[in-house]
């Protein structure tokens, strides 16, 4: 098996230690695992996978390298496309249900200012939700992004009586 986190050249982002997904005191548990959401990280990961497959199966090296090159080109085009499409959104604050998009946000200078559910195993408390609601109003947040696998009831309740829209990010 290959540990992608050890791939040379990756941009690595860490959670705050007081945040979540902490177990056993292992420093690696503070690393945000959503590495691929930065297209340049994804490119480095594709290169690493191709390299590992080539070493394990040299007879198929040409096919691995060809597939790697093709996917890297697609990821570079995706990066350019996202850079253009997200450029107008750089100064627009938003909130997310779950803090899974840090790599995307940092790569494209997006302005996340709030998170509904910080810990995946525990629902947020009333104090956190009240604070988030005030922050959304004070910062002029227009959109809260949620994910399809999470029940929308919590975000619907949070946004009730506000002008903040909800959209699904998948």
Outline where the language-model segments fall.
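Extracytoplasmic metal-acquisition and chelation regions
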Residues: 1-170
């Amino acid at each position: 098996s290959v540990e992608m986190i050890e791939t040379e050249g990756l941009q690595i982002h860490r959670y705050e230690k007081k945040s979540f997904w902490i177990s056993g005191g292992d420093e690696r548990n503070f690393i945000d695992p959503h590495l691929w959401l930065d297209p340049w990280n994804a490119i480095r990961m594709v290169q690493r996978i191709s390299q590992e497959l080539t070493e394990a199966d040299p007879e198929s090296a040409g096919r691995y390298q060809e597939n790697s090159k093709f996917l890297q080109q697609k990821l570079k085009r995706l990066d350019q496309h996202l850079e253009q499409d997200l450029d107008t959104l750089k100064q627009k604050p938003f909130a997310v249900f779950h803090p899974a998009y840090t790599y995307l946000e940092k790569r494209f200078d997006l302005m996340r200012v709030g998170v509904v559910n910080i810990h995946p195993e525990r629902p947020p408390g009333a104090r956190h939700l009240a604070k988030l609601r005030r922050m959304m109003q004070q910062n002029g947040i227009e959109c809260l992004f949620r994910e399809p696998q999470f029940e929308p009831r919590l975000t619907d309740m949070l946004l009730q009586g506000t002008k903040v829209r909800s959209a699904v990010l998948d």
